[in-house]
A protein has these predicted regions:
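Core catalytic alpha/beta fold that binds nucleotide/phospho-ligands
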Residues: 1-238
Length: 238
């Protein structure tokens, strides 16, 4: 088993047409049925790319044939693998804007979240409603120009933990609290697990990963779905 977690970043709208035409065979029967039911072209391409690339990456990671991948969906909607020799492999994916991110690793449940949104209005009312009181106060004390980025950084970190837990946002954003003034220390009121949370500025937003490992490798796929050499060009961390 691998002791690292790999993150794969891809612009799902920038995949070459020659690659798109060859992705359908990578879908399993259920995925193909779901894909065929999608009418909106952008959403249809996004679904095809995300599921086909996920299956390709899992096949490579496990060293198994794609038809042997067996998925199930947890009680709160989180997908996982259940086939022979696959239970140790954990994965998670997230979309935002044009971008897709897939996390794969063997060291326990993973949660990944990508937030590229920009709010025209102040994020403080949302933070007051969904965040812990101390987090709201942290945002309120920041200069107005910094509040938007800090809000999405908090949201991304929180959602990554909630996805690793498996309950998603319904489990409660306020149950996962961060203390930015203490190196973004996690106060986990949800399940007590000591998740290791990493984040990176990406495309003007934030990418966060929650899991059990501190060794994370980032990769970017090009329009031909090949891994690009070198590290992805991350934004400067504010």
């Amino acid at each position: 088993m691998m002791t690292t977690t790999d993150l794969f970043l891809l612009n799902a709208t920038n995949v070459a047409q020659t690659q798109l035409s060859g992705l359908e065979p990578w879908l399993n029967a259920l995925q193909r049925q779901q894909w065929q039911q999608i009418k909106q072209p952008r959403r249809r391409q996004e679904f095809l790319v995300s599921r086909a690339v996920l299956n390709r990456l899992l096949t490579s990671h496990l060293g198994q044939d794609p038809q042997n991948l067996h998925f199930y969906t947890g009680p709160h909607g989180k997908p996982a693998l259940t086939g022979p020799g696959q239970e140790h492999c954990h994965f998670n994916l997230s979309h935002s804007g044009d971008w897709l991110v897939i996390a794969i690793g063997d060291q326990g449940p993973l949660g990944v979240d990508l937030e590229l949104g920009r709010r025209a209005r102040s994020p403080l009312p949302l933070a007051q409603r969904f965040f812990a009181a101390a987090e709201y106060q942290y945002l309120a004390d920041l200069p107005q120009a910094e509040q938007n980025s800090a809000f999405y950084r908090l949201w991304s970190r929180k959602e990554a933990v909630l996805k690793a837990h498996g309950g998603g946002i319904a489990a409660g954003l306020d149950k996962v609290e961060f203390v930015p003034q203490q190196k973004w220390c996690l106060l986990n009121h949800l399940d007590g697990v000591d998740y290791r949370v990493h984040d990176w500025p990406w495309q003007g937003g934030w990418l966060s990963l929650a899991g059990r490992t501190s060794d994370v490798h980032l990769h970017q796929l090009d329009e031909c779905l090949e891994i690009m050499t070198g590290q992805p060009h991350l934004d400067k961390n504010p």
